[in-house]
Design a protein with these regions (language model features):
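Patatin-like phospholipase
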Residues: 1-34, 42-337
């Protein structure tokens, strides 16, 4: 299970790298993700680790945060269409709530320019990195979590069931951060990032738990999220939590630089090793013992076979000697045997 977190998602590639090197990734039978976690889940379902790592190591901010000129009035309309401000992003200023106009201007100022971002660059990355035919024919469910608006209801989509175009739209929707990207339309409904606080699900365990899996690996991108294990009473949840802060909004979530990806991949690998290292070493030792036992058994079998062969040869030699003695005896008695 892969949590959302924008540019911090490179951390999950590091976790995958460790599992891949140890051969543990072959035992994963379902993946689920929100936002960048959904993209990484799709990369995992595509089955090509090296392609996923190359994508993250060569990523450029301009590929994700593609400029799209937009004015403050347009941002106001955009926020209004999303239908999220009053329900989620109303900001109290004393006894009053900041108006949509003030919020829009603040967002534009925060971004440093009067524009939001298009999805053109991410669409290119999706087409470059994903093997949709592999996803569609896989036995591995691959869930993307999105938030339907304006009702703010959580929706889960198994990407195997959709065409390349529809799956791309769902991945864009799952990562459509309000105030940064526009919402996405899918089959007549509009969707935003599935990890929006309070109403979304940034750690989407439910889809894989509902499959009846008894062990779920959760790869967090934040040190703050706490999972209620009582909601999954029949499953063991193994959590991989960043041992260092992966960054905030600007230097983490919106950090789509190659340098940022490199150190987060290293950190993910390191943290996965800390969680699974003992298990892997025990498994290796068990495997060594199994190989030793198999070698011993083969040696024992070879010894038994050789012993039986020698005994058979000795028996033939004794029979031949007895036959020679009998022939000599008969000859001495003048009897023809």
């Amino acid at each position: 299970m892969l949590a959302g977190g924008g540019g911090k998602g490179a951390y999950q590639i590091g976790v995958w790298k460790y599992l891949h090197e140890c051969g543990l990734d072959q035992y994963v039978c379902a993946v689920s993700g929100t936002s960048v976690g959904a993209l990484n889940a799709a990369l995992f379902a595509s089955g090509n680790y090296q392609r996923a790592e190359d994508l993250w190591l060569n990523i450029q901010p301009s590929q994700i945060l593609s400029p799209k000129k937009i004015s403050v009035p347009e941002i106001v309309g955009w926020i209004g269409r999303a239908g999220l401000v009053k329900g989620i992003y109303g900001v109290a200023a004393g006894a009053a709530t900041v108006s949509m106009q003030a919020l829009a201007a603040g967002v534009a100022t925060m971004l440093g320019r009067r524009y939001a971002f298009s999805r053109d660059g991410l669409i290119g990355l999706i087409k470059q990195g994903l093997d949709f035919s592999a996803i569609q024919t896989s036995n591995m469910p691959c869930y993307a979590t999105c938030l339907a608006i304006p009702e703010c209801s959580i929706r889960r989509f198994d990407l195997r069931q959709y065409s390349e175009e529809e799956a791309t739209t769902l991945l864009l929707a799952s990562s459509a951060i309000p105030l940064v990207f526009d919402s996405e339309e899918f089959r007549g409904e509009r969707y935003y990032d599935g990890g929006i606080p309070l109403v979304g699900d940034n750690v989407p365990i439910k889809p894989v738990y509902d499959l009846g899996l008894d062990c779920i690996i959760v790869v967090h991108l934040s040190q703050d999220y706490v999972i209620d294990h009582s909601l999954c009473p029949n499953a063991k949840i193994v959590e991989i939590v960043p041992q260092v802060n992966l960054g905030g909004a600007v230097n983490g979530t919106l950090d789509f630089t190659a340098a940022g990806s490199q150190w987060r991949i290293r950190q993910g690998y390191h943290d996965a090793e800390k969680v699974f290292g003992m298990f892997v070493e025990v498994a290796k030792l068990k495997r060594v013992n199994e190989l030793f036992l198999q070698a011993f058994q083969r040696s024992e079998q070879a010894y038994q076979q050789r012993s039986q062969t020698l005994q058979a040869e000795r028996h033939k030699q004794l029979e031949a000697q007895e036959l020679d003695r009998f022939s000599e005896l008969c000859k001495g008695l003048g009897i023809t045997p």
